[in-house]
Amino acid sequence: MSGGGSSSGPRSKDRNLNGRSAQYDEVPADPRHPETNLETLHDRDLALSADPLPPPPLPLHPPFGAEFYPSDSEEPVTTLELRPVRRFIPDSWKNIFKGKKENPWENPMTEINYTSGGVPCSPPRSPSLPASEPHGKNLAGDSKTVASSYRDPYGGSGGSYNSRREEEAMLPHDPYGSLGRQTQTVKTYSERVEEYNMRYAYMKSWAGLLRILCIVELLLGAAVFACVTAYIHKDNEWYNMFGYSQPYGYTASMQGGYYYSGPKTPFVLVVAGLAWIVTIILLVLGMSMYYRTILLDSTWWPLTEFGINISLFILYMAGAIVYVNDTNRGGLCYYQLFNTPVNASFCRVEGGQTAAIIFLFVSMLMYFISAMVSLKLWRHESARKRREFLGQEMNPNQISPPKVMREVALGNGHMIDVPDQQRDMRKVEMKPELLSGYIPAGHIPKPIVMPDYVAKYQAIKAEDERERYKAVFNDQFAEYKELHAEVQAVMKKFSELDAVMQKLPRNPENQHEYERIAKVLQEYQKKKNEPTFLEKKERCEYLKNKLSHIKQRIQEYDKVMDWNDGYN
């Protein structure tokens, strides 16, 4: 009893010590151990505790090659190498600018925190280890099995609670982790060309031409600003020599009523800068969806753009005239009294000034062209809106009010979409256009579309006519019932197929799947637009309207006859 008590004391103590690492109870034992029999088990020392061994710390070297099992001749790791290295720029920031990820095993040893908290006591000997062998023998062989047999299901290693970062630093990333991700299908060349055409198709229109002209105007405006600014030092020389007064006392009468007070280069720079800012605003606005969807549908914006371009044209024309006048100093360079060797530098026209004059007049011409294109855009949009209005007037039945859906709670946590009750949108019937005077050239009268049964089955005037209408109604009603049942069956089948088509994947995983789904959808659309089915559907709708018209005529006649009988 005493022996049992003495042996149970250390065992309970070990259990209490291992109680802090209870999450390692699912670690499997080492499957690789030498074959033993009953006699060898009797000769071995049993462990002091029945608890499973804690997993050892992760290896210091990569698990491949001869370097995984270091030799005993290597120098031990010093305490300085165990300190964490703190860098001014983290390695995660450096990896952003690298195209290829570095191998974690290539990092220096000091960057890997390979220490482990371990357990406060030394582990007991394994039952598979012979008692005759020393405890430190075959350490290298044991490290092979131990390092590869224990795996922590909780994310740690060696009894350490914060060893997840050690595992991330030591083990490389899973090379097969990307196989589970959804692969993106590569677009074909034709699909990319179609997408490009859809995105930039508006550049072929008059609005796109305006955007191209804006880009050219920005380049010319920048050239004007640069060329004019390059020779602004001549203005300082002029004001330093003559000030703000007329040189040599020339009066207005001698100049023919003209007075030149000095260079007007600031005015030219202000004109170029203002035009550049307005042009870049027009360019950015024209590239937006707001311009294409809202502004082009308005009646005032094309005319506003025309006014802006005309204003900039006038400003550039004024700036060009002022700058040309500055090059000959208001006509003073044509007088011999002023054009002396001392003042020759003021009358000399440099190459940059000539380029500035050319750019000024070309920019003026570009803004005039933009104004004309704006007028053309205004006429084009007006014609487009008129065509759309005429198309809506010719086909009023094809326009249906939008169906507004709203969510309704069922009470069990589910929501369904039901059509919201809306006010009936009454159709506004357009009155026929009345033309007074002569018929304008190119006028096409609008045809009046009327079903044939309206003119054929007019108001009933006699009893035999009523019987004839009734016979036609009974004869074609059977055909209508048969067609209606057939069309309704097909429409029900189509509604079921629509629900199935909605469940098809929108983003297939590969190109083969994408082509297969596209082929199925194409065949389905072909079935829905089959001429035979569409003809039956049209015939059913026609018979429905015709029979309703005949029935209305019969009811009107019966009402009149009942009224006459009651009166008599």
Swiss-Prot record:
Ranges annotated as biased composition (Basic and acidic residues): 29-46
Membrane topology: Multi-pass membrane protein
Regions crossing the membrane: 212-232, 267-287, 304-324, 355-375
Region of interest (Disordered), ranges: 1-72, 116-163
Extracellular side: 233-266, 325-354
Topological domains annotated Cytoplasmic: 1-211, 288-303, 376-568
Coiled coil: 462-559
Domain OCEL intervals: 451-562
Entry keyword set: Cell junction, Cell membrane, Coiled coil, Membrane, Tight junction, Transmembrane, Transmembrane helix
Pfam families documented for this protein: MARVEL, Occludin_ELL
GO cellular component, one term: bicellular tight junction
Cysteines paired by S-S bonds: none
SUPFAM superfamilies linked to this entry: occludin/ELL-like
Source organism, top-level taxon: Eukaryota
Cell compartments where the protein resides: Cell membrane; Cell junction, Tight junction
Major localisation: membrane
Residue ranges constituting the MARVEL domain according to the UniProt record: 205-379
Annotated Pro residues bias: 52-62
Role description: May play a role in the formation of the epithelial barrier.
Family to which the UniProt record says this protein belongs: Belongs to the ELL/occludin family.
Protein name: MARVEL domain-containing protein 2
Species of the source: Xenopus tropicalis
